[in-house]
Regions:
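Alpha-helical tetratricopeptide repeat
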Residues: 1-186
Length: 186
């Protein structure tokens, strides 16, 4: 009887603990905290958003989200090396932010560091899984630069299956197009 009562109390304790404990990660809390700046980026007010996230980084130097969004602003302002720095800082604080890998890969690609870009896109594909096709498309573009054409074609086909129209357009261009055989009339 005592064991049943203790088991029941333990289950009640677990239920209360589950519902009363905060389940948000630090990144989720930061996204909510920096909602104003994120909206500025979405509204394409990049300079204002950069100032916002620059202040956020100064006030919250341990915030991966602040570094990540400042890095995204740097990328949009074509400050690729600064973007790489900010995104590297964000990843060193929280290595689960998938967009950081994608953005850092784009920054590496923009400065013609294709091997590093491919590595970042590969990590982005792993983190994003099959939720967004742009990681597959960017990995394919980096693979083209590295002369990995067949793997690039597979990535582009995967991106097309996920709904990426840009990947479809890339598949219609060389080196993926094959010439049609010429039929001669005799």
């Amino acid at each position: 009887m005592e064991i049943a009562l203790l088991s029941l109390l333990f289950v009640v304790y677990l239920v209360f603990r589950y519902y009363l404990i905060d389940h948000e990660t630090a990144a989720d809390k930061d996204v909510r905290r920096f909602e104003k700046g994120i909206q500025l980026v979405k509204d394409r007010k990049i300079e204002t958003a950069f100032d916002y996230f620059n202040d956020a980084v100064l006030k919250n130097p341990k915030s991966a989200v602040a570094y990540a969004w400042r890095g995204k602003c740097q990328l949009n302002l074509a400050n690729h090396h600064s973007a790489i720095y900010d995104l590297t800082q964000a990843i060193s604080i929280d290595n689960t932010l998938a967009d950081c890998y994608l953005d850092r890969g784009i920054a590496f690609y923009s400065v013609d560091q294709f091997t590093e870009a491919f590595r970042e896109f590969d990590k982005a594909v792993w983190h994003i899984r099959d939720e967004r096709p742009d990681a597959y498309r960017w990995r394919a573009v980096a693979r083209i630069q590295l002369r990995q054409i067949s793997q690039a074609e597979n990535d582009l086909r995967r991106a097309v299956l996920l709904g990426d129209e840009d990947a479809f357009q890339l598949l219609r261009q060389p080196p993926f197009t094959r010439p049609q055989p010429v039929k001669s009339k005799r």
